[in-house]
């Protein structure tokens, strides 16, 4: 399943649309809604009191996972995901990432498209049930990259 994703706008997955809204706060706080914008599906919150960038992912009030930037990724970004045994690997350009499951199976491939006015990512997600979670991690990575620039 392919998701063409305009970060900061609408995210379309087949017949589903996610709307992302940022909140004014210390650190990034991104809320994900369904297309009607009536039902909040998830939240990505930056933890500001940590040595290295760290984001917590929430469904309702429950923290379901974290993404941490590892400090010593000299030639390519290194992130640590604490969610369902997932692992993420990125390339040195910080445009392409692969998320794998605990047995090494591909959960998602993420690639950034160039020549767009906004950050645009294409997400190839193996299981549609993981779409929201993959989107949350992509938003966290994009927010971390924005904080550096």
At which residue positions do the language-model features occur?
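Single conserved hydrophobic/aromatic residue that forms the stacking wall/gate
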Residues: 1-7, 13
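Short loop/turn microsegments at loop-to-beta-strand junctions
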Residues: 8, 28, 94-95
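Beta-strand-rich structural segments
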Residues: 8-10, 32, 99
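Generic N-terminal leader/processing signal
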Residues: 11-12, 19, 43-45, 104
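A positional/architectural concept
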Residues: 14-26, 30
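Long terminal segments
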Residues: 24, 36-39, 45-46, 51-149
């Amino acid at each position: 399943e392919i998701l063409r994703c305009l970060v900061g706008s609408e995210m379309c997955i087949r017949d589903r649309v996610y709307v992302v809204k940022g909140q004014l706060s210390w650190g990034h706080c991104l809320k994900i809604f369904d297309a009607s914008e009536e039902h909040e599906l998830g939240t990505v919150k930056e933890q500001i009191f940590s040595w290295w960038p760290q984001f917590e992912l929430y469904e309702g009030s429950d923290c379901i996972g974290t993404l941490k930037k590892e400090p010593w990724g000299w030639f390519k970004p290194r992130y640590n995901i604490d969610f369902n045994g997932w692992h993420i690997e990125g390339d040195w350009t910080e445009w392409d990432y692969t998320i794998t499951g605990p047995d090494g199976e591909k959960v998602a491939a993420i690639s950034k498209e160039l020549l767009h006015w906004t950050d645009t990512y294409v997400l190839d997600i193996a299981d549609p049930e993981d779409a929201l979670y993959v989107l949350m991690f992509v938003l966290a990575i994009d927010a971390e990259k924005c904080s550096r620039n």
